[in-house]
Amino acid sequence: MKTLYSLRRFYPVETLFNGTLALAGRDQETTGFAWWAGNARLINLSGKLLGAHVAHAGLIVFWAGAMNLFEVAHFVPEKPMYEQGLILLPHLATLGWGVGPGGEVIDTFPYFVSGVLHLISSAVLGFGGIYHALLGPETLEESFPFFGYVWKDRNKMTTILGIHLILLGIGAFLLVLKALYFGGVYDTWAPGGGDVRRITNLTLSPSVIFGYLLKSPFGGEGWIVSVDDLEDIIGGHVWVGAICILGGTWHILTKPFAWARRALVWSGEAYLSYSLGALSVFGFIACCFVWFNNTAYPSEFYGPTGPEASQAQAFTFLVRDQRLGANVGSAQGPTGLGKYLMRSPTGEVIFGGETMRFWDLRAPWLEPLRGPNGLDLSRLKKDIQPWQERRSAEYMTHAPLGSLNSVGGVATEINAVNYVSPRSWLATSHFVLGFFLFVGHLWHAGRARAAAAGFEKGIDRDFEPVLSMTPLN
């Protein structure tokens, strides 16, 4: 018969901060953990830990629903989304809900529905969280062995990993289904300035999809962040979804190999550190994606990227001065290079001036003016459309630069608008959170390894200075 470790709440791999092993209670004396390490009390109480996780999910979903409705209530259809401090509606718009040609919002009802659905879901999760935290069984091993676990049980842990991977794979396929069958998604590259369309011709070629992973991360290459058509993005989700589901099935059906059993630490704190490390990587990648990529994060909703705003400024003044009679092909700038156009070191024609550093920008309002050797002079003279001028002028004055007190835009741009771009918020927040998660990964990895090696003692709580101080109250 399997030993029920849950009946012995404390076992050697998990490290206590003092030697007390008495059961029950919520204080330091009975649990071995001070108030600030409250989660640690639940390490071996699978039922209570389930309650904590479900309640946490409820809080997250409640925030999503409430914030969603808050943004709907404050939304002004006449202004671009990125001028209104919105961080949720741009995601819904990118999925093709409520928008039409050019990214114009034609119906806010889907956004309202999204908010209400999240609020209802959060109530269900909140009830489940409170039930499992207060009323449900403390441990699940005895009554519900399928949901029970012991942190040291390697086979059960990889089964749980497999279930999580399958759920992630299903999530990836939900986006694929939305793009293929349920109204499509917003494509910023659709002719004439973007539109919602169904993705019919998926990119499934492994050489293309995995080619992104093999690219250099630097300018002109840009690793996976350089993806710039929806066929590749949705095709990539097919691959990711399939790999997650197959990998999840594999982890459910197999037991860890001997090398994995030896190499990894098998404790709750170790799994926490692995998870934090993975989330940290996701955060850093998301930061780069939202900052540089204007296909997955269309500029119509998130505002222009930094390079895009800079190139838009060069384009706007090229249009203006060309109308005033300047010969933009040969005009010389203050450094002796071309004032409006110049050649890059590899020979293609790019915008001149300081924006030359952003030569590798690709944007839907600019690409129609390129030829085989970069910007095409005859197209710049004859083919510029009014929507391209309007969009670049708008992006020029909405650079994603700014501070928390909303002094946004380029410091030298007299037409800049006081706003902070959602791109700035999303990139900065994901970088900062990614960094903190990385620090948490190092902290918990160090503790888990030390505990596994048997020399983690923690701080001696019996002689802590605070214990001899006068109570605050």
Curated annotation (Swiss-Prot):
[CaMn4O5] cluster binds at residue 367. Gene3D superfamilies: photosystem ii from thermosynechococcus elongatus. The chain crosses the membrane at residues 69-93, 134-155, 178-200, 255-275, 291-312, 447-471. It comes from the Eukaryota. The gene is psbC. GO terms for biological process: photosynthetic electron transport in photosystem II. It is a multi-pass membrane protein. Belongs to the PsbB/PsbC family. PsbC subfamily. The keyword Nucleotide-binding does not apply. Binds multiple chlorophylls and provides some of the ligands for the Ca-4Mn-5O cluster of the oxygen-evolving complex. It may also provide a ligand for a Cl- that is required for oxygen evolution. PSII binds additional chlorophylls, carotenoids and specific lipids. InterPro entries: PS_antenna-like (IPR000932), PS_II_antenna-like_sf (IPR036001), PSII_PsbC (IPR005869), PSII_PsbC_sf (IPR044900). It holds the Pfam family PSII. Keywords: Acetylation, Chlorophyll, Chloroplast, Chromophore, Manganese, Membrane, Metal-binding, Phosphoprotein, Photosynthesis, Photosystem II, Plastid, Thylakoid, Transmembrane, Transmembrane helix. Residues 1-14 form a propeptide. One of its GO terms (cellular component) is chloroplast thylakoid membrane. The modification Phosphothreonine is found at residue 15. One of its GO terms (molecular function) is electron transporter, transferring electrons within the cyclic electron transport pathway of photosynthesis activity. It is found in: Plastid, Chloroplast thylakoid membrane. PSII is composed of 1 copy each of membrane proteins PsbA, PsbB, PsbC, PsbD, PsbE, PsbF, PsbH, PsbI, PsbJ, PsbK, PsbL, PsbM, PsbT, PsbX, PsbY, PsbZ, Psb30/Ycf12, at least 3 peripheral proteins of the oxygen-evolving complex and a large number of cofactors. It forms dimeric complexes. This is Photosystem II CP43 reaction center protein. The modification N-acetylthreonine is found at residue 15.
